[in-house]
Amino acid sequence: MIMKPPVRSEEEISKTLLSLLNAYETSDIPKLQELISRDVDIHIHELDLYGRAAFFRIYEPERFVLSKYSVKIDGHVGWSYGTIRKNDEVMHFSIVLREKRRHHWKVVHVHLSDASL
């Protein structure tokens, strides 16, 4: 059996992040399940969610656009941070951490905070 080599490029994390936002906007639940870890930790303002099931209980599709974001990798952990825009206004700063599992990037932590604070 030939194993696929681990993906180690910042470009792959960027593609994963864009796929996540597209799936979020289009209600592509199977894609969201593929990209978000079952044990994801999510912090949005004062709301803390633990696990993918908790996320899906509050999920509503919306369109967000990444603006000015960076990607870093250290071994099997990568992270992206920057701003998310909605209707051309900065809505949140975002930090999204990813960890490779079975040679795929999975979202394991999301932190969104109000850009006006």
Predicted regions and their residues:
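Short, low-complexity N-terminal intrinsically disordered segments enriched in polar/charged residues
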Residues: 1-26, 30, 34, 38
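Short solvent-exposed beta->alpha transition segments
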Residues: 14, 33-69
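Hydrophobic pocket/interface hotspot
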Residues: 20, 32, 40, 55, ...
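Short beta-strand segments enriched in hydrophobic/aromatic residues
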Residues: 36, 84-86, 111
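Hydrophobic/anchoring residues in structured secondary elements
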Residues: 42, 71, 110-112
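Surface-exposed, charged secondary-structure patches
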Residues: 53-96
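Short beta-strand edge/turn micro-motifs at domain boundaries
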Residues: 90-117
